[in-house]
UniProtKB/Swiss-Prot annotation:
Main subcellular localisation: host cell
Record-annotated CoV 3a-like viroporin CD domain positions: 135-214
Subcellular localization(s) per the UniProt record: Host membrane
Gene Ontology terms: cellular component: host cell membrane; membrane
Pfam short name (any one): Corona_NS3b
Record keyword Magnesium present: no
Keyword set includes Mitochondrion: no
Origin species: Porcine transmissible gastroenteritis coronavirus (strain FS772/70)
InterPro entries tied to this protein: a/bCoV_VIROPORIN_3A-like_CD (IPR046446), a/bCoV_VIROPORIN_3A-like_TM (IPR046445), Coronavirus_Orf3a/b (IPR004293)
Membrane topology annotation: Multi-pass membrane protein
Protein name (Swiss-Prot/TrEMBL): Non-structural protein 3b
Membrane-spanning intervals of the chain: 46-66, 75-95, 102-122
Length: 244
């Protein structure tokens, strides 16, 4: 197929219709009604046979328009492919006669781009289009996709160490974690601060950002024996010896 990704449903129906008409042009007048009925059935069958191809075209373009990734390089590659699809591939399909595929590809991608461009205009950040999302979190000027929880509450957890945390593919260093804040912009609008820094056994930290203060953290990952061992080590470390 030249210049196209999918089968053109309309072109196959038209070609099949013409071939059937040419083959039945010299049929006797008595059998004409029967031939017309057969012709209608064949064209309908051909149209139904190419419905899956048209559905695949729509699903693929919809998937491409909505697909998002957290990797920066992957997002750049997908964005470039979308731009080429809207400006080059779509018009090429229309020029070669694949009207359905070309119109669907260009229309769906253009509508998605226009929808995200609104958030780009309101917040003055191009990352809405780059990450293909309507909600972003900004950590000291660095943008990353924001993932909502299952019950739509707004909070963020970032993994890191004693003086750094990972924001998507970036590493943010800080002196005091209490000075780090997160701004949620887009469909959701919120400002989050660090409410809890959870230290793990390996020395790493999980930083919890929320609008509500954390009352406590329940530790359910350790058995009672491990907890007793940790308490004993802490007691030994707190002992002081008087040497005279």
């Amino acid at each position: 197929m030249i210049g196209g990704l999918f089968l053109n449903t309309l072109s196959f129906v038209i070609v099949s219709n013409h071939s059937i008409v040419n083959n039945t042009a010299n049929v006797h007048h008595i059998q004409q009604e029967r031939v017309i009925v057969q012709q209608h059935q064949v064209v309908s069958a051909i149209t139904q046979n190419y419905y899956p191809e048209f559905s695949i075209a729509v699903l693929f373009v919809s998937f491409l328009a909505l697909y998002r990734s957290t990797n920066f390089k992957t997002c750049v590659g997908i964005l470039m492919f979308k731009i080429l699809s809207m400006t080059l591939l779509g018009p090429m399909l229309i020029a070669y006669g694949y009207y359905i595929d070309g119109i669907v590809t260009t229309t769906v991608l253009s509508l998605r781009f226009a929808y995200l461009a609104y958030f780009w205009y309101v917040n003055s950040r191009f990352e809405f289009i780059l990450y293909n999302t309507t909600t972003l979190m900004f950590v000291h000027g660095r943008a990353a996709p924001f993932k909502r929880s299952s019950h739509s509450s707004i909070y963020v957890t970032l993994y890191g160490g004693i003086n750094y945390m990972f924001v998507n593919d970036l590493t943010l260093h800080f002196v005091d974690p209490m000075l780090v804040s997160i701004a949620i912009r887009g469909l959701a609008h919120a400002d989050l601060t660090v409410v809890r820094a959870v230290e793990l056994l390996n020395g790493d930290f999980i930083y919890v950002f929320s609008q509500e203060p954390v009352v406590g953290v329940y530790n359910a990952a350790f058995s009672q024996a491990v907890l007793n061992e940790i308490d004993l080590k802490e007691e030994e470390g707190d002992r002081t010896y008087d040497v005279s």
